[in-house]
Amino acid sequence: MANGIYKVTEDFEKALSEYTGAKYVVTVDNMSNALFLSLYYENHIEENIKDGFVTCPKRTYPSVPCEIIHSGLKVEFTENYGCLDMEKGTLKGAYKLGNSNVYDSALRFTADMYLKGTHMCVSFTGPYKHFKLS
């Protein structure tokens, strides 16, 4: 289907790649699945999560710890939200799921936002998003 839904998706992924600076972009149906796939890949394919747990903020959406568990890992809650400013080397509106290379970037979508070697999960739905698709 050269001009069907697959072409639209491919064009969208390419535009996201160019905008964010990521070499690869994969679109999925929602943020929960993006987190699950990224954590599963980190845990089962790359085997980067050696001790079997991932930290996340105590105050987050319920889907975040659920996807950590769903990917075969254990959750450790923390007070550290990891949402500092870029001058300090961290991202405002995003946080790293500790002990992994996965970022929950649900509230951040900016040009050249990609951090090399990470899996940055971005969401386009919800009331606080910068780029609304729904």
Residue ranges: model-predicted function:
Residues 1-33, 41:
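Conserved N-terminal alpha-helix of the aminotransferase class I/II PLP-enzyme fold
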Residues 22, 31-32, 79-82, 126:
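Short, acidic/glycine-rich phosphate-metal binding loop used to engage nucleotide
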Residues 28, 57, 123:
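Conserved residues at the C-terminal ends of beta-strands
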Residues 28, 78, 120:
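Hydrophobic residues at beta-strand termini and immediately following loops
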Residues 34-36, 62-65, 109-111:
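Short, well-ordered alpha-helical microsegments
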Residues 40, 44-102:
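PLP-dependent aminotransferase-like
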Residues 87-134:
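Conserved active-site segment immediately N-terminal to the catalytic lysine
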